[in-house]
Amino acid sequence: QEKLDEKKKFYVDSGQPAKFYQEYMMEVQSAEDSIFNMRHINYWDGMFKTDGDFAFLQIDGQEIPVNPYLGVDPATDSERRESDYSVIIAIAVDENNTVYVLDYLRQRGLPVLGIPGEEKKGIVDHIFEYNSIFKPRITVIEDTTMSRPVFQSITSEMRRRNDFSVKAKAEKPGTRMSKRDRIQEIMAQRFAIGAVKIKKSHYDLQHEIITFGSRM
């Protein structure tokens, strides 16, 4: 795994992440079908810090005030859990509405809650961890039938932990547009003007961005 990570870093640093996934992960993507390409990728390099209720980024010696947020897309039912990824993403937004990706979790096989006494954590355990680190203004969770156990577990865990700081909000995905159309309408404009920035270490996220579209 370490050698594979080194090869992934080499291809990402050379501006050819898709080549890594094509050669080593057997994933092929048509560039013509992709919504985004490497020109849409903008990086940021710095630190996220909090001081009480105040959050800011330290970039090139400057402190940039930001509002942190958490987004959660759970795959928690028994059928989806092993095939689909559960995702938690932490972002920060500055006064110019620029989005900085702080960190993310992308993992298959996540239960709603981990079993006490065992190392494996559930998605709710990770939500509390991310909430403690980034202190998001709000945690948005996609509101589906499958996510309802997540909300129930957050409520019960807040009581058990005596920690009521998670500000969870349900967000319905909507049915008027497909996910691809929603991304094209909302995210493509942000990427086009450089209003979304990720870190160079976000290999999997970069891959998801530049290969979003139909597979060959």
Segments the model singles out, each with a brief description of its role:
Residues D13, P17, R81-D84, S147:
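Active-site-proximal structural scaffolding
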Residues F56-I64, S78-E82, E129-I133:
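Short, conserved, surface-exposed binding loops centered on an aromatic residue
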Residues L70-G71, A90, V140:
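Structured core elements
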Residues Q1-F10, E27-A31, I35, D94-R215:
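Mg2+-dependent endonuclease catalytic cores in nucleic-acid-processing enzymes, primarily RNase H-like
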Residues P68, R81-D84, P116, K120:
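Hydrophobic alpha-helical segments and helix-packing faces
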Residues Q1-A75:
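ATPase catalytic-site recognition across NTP-hydrolyzing enzymes
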Residues V72-I88:
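An active-site-proximal beta-strand-loop segment
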